[in-house]
């Protein structure tokens, strides 16, 4: 009797629906129309799927052999407007491009618990865009773009008004910004490799209580920027080979109550620029081979800069501020 009761309380498992030549459905669109919540749609890499998809129910959309979904340079390629969706193992390419509208390979809006994993994004204006979403994961994806015109170049991973996002172990290159967060809180960005972006490898604005750790940022034209935020933790990242007249390993602008610890700033024009930082804890960083190792400017107050290694910089540290209660102690020069 107890066994029967347990069976009755278990949720029903979804079906598996195959898409491809000789399968149950020839197109993903038709499979989505037939699918019920929590079904798994398996897309086989037997052709290029020139489709535009709207996912409005909780499903798993999984590719076998990295099938290509091609938007033919029209609109968003895939739109997600449901919770509990998994996008797995697809190549998503050729969204529309516009200087007026932000098109994307994968557009997720007003959703929670969406997972994007093991996908390849190519030649999209924005690759992955989240709006008003939470509890989402972007992991193990490869993202790049061939767009070179600034007016239509978008970001690889773009999050706006989101909470509790996990962005990890992605390889990103050749976008405007690699990872862009605006009004994004309580999120983790870790173990990503971002290089060759036309602006910032990582760009935070108005985003609080976030952690980014063990990321590798190189050859990004403006470096990395964390701006107008508080309670941000930056641990064990590498910022290297970000060079130019307005390029920094890490640019801090109006940041409060944050920790910068265990990072490496290597061979940048400016390793670390702190402009208007207050109550920052900057410790155990390696700042090596930069033009300026660290610049502390403007109204930066109550910052603790201690036990960092400054090695082989043209200028280890420069400042244009008076004392302002900053503590600089125990560094190696």
What are these model-predicted stretches?
Residues 15-44, 48:
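Acidic Gly/Asp/Thr-rich repetitive segments characteristic of extracellular carbohydrate-active
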Residues 71-79, 99-108, 123-130, 150-160, ...:
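Extracellular beta-strand/beta-solenoid scaffold signature
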Residues 9-11:
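N-terminal signal peptide c-region/cleavage motif recognized by signal peptidases
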Residues 23, 47, 53, 59, ...:
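Residues at the loop-to-beta-strand transition
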Residues 42, 54, 60-62, 70, ...:
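Extracellular beta-strand solenoid repeats
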Residues 108-113, 118, 130, 184, ...:
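Extracellular beta-rich repeat passengers
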Residues 37, 48-60, 69-114, 126-133, ...:
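Extracellular beta-strand-rich solenoid/capping regions of secreted or surface-exposed proteins
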């Amino acid at each position: 009797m107890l066994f029967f009761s347990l069976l009755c309380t278990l949720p029903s498992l979804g079906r598996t629906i195959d898409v491809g030549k000789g399968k149950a459905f020839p197109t993903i669109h038709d499979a989505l129309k037939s699918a019920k919540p929590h079904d798994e749609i398996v897309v086989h890499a037997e052709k290029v799927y020139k489709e535009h998809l709207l996912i409005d129910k909780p499903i798993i959309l999984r590719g076998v052999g990295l099938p290509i979904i091609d938007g033919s340079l029209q609109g968003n390629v895939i739109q997600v407007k449901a919770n509990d969706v998994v996008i797995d193992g697809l190549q998503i390419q050729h969204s529309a491009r516009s200087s007026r509208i932000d098109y994307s390979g994968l557009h997720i809006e007003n959703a929670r618990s969406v997972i994007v994993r093991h996908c390849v994004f190519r030649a999209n204006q924005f690759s992955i865009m989240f709006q008003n979403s939470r509890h989402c994961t972007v992991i193990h994806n490869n993202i790049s773009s061939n767009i070179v015109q600034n007016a239509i170049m978008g970001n690889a991973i773009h999050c706006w008004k989101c909470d509790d996002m996990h962005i990890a172990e992605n390889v990103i290159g050749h976008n405007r910004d690699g990872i862009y967060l605006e009004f994004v809180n309580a999120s983790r960005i870790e173990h990503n490799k971002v290089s060759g972006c036309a602006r910032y490898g990582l760009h935070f604005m108005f985003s609080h209580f976030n952690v980014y750790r063990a990321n590798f940022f190189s050859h990004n034209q403006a470096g990395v920027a964390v701006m107008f935020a508080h309670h941000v933790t930056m641990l064990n990242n590498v910022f290297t080979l970000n060079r130019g007249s307005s390029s920094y390993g890490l640019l801090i602008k109006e940041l409060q109550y944050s920790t910068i610890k265990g990072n490496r700033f290597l061979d940048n024009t400016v390793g670390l620029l702190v402009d208007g930082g207050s109550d920052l804890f900057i410790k155990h960083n390696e700042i090596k081979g930069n033009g300026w190792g660290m610049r502390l400017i403007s109204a930066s107050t109550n910052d603790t800069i201690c036990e960092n290694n400054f090695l082989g910089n043209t200028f280890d540290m420069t400042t244009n501020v008076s004392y302002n209660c900053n503590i600089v102690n125990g560094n190696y020069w």
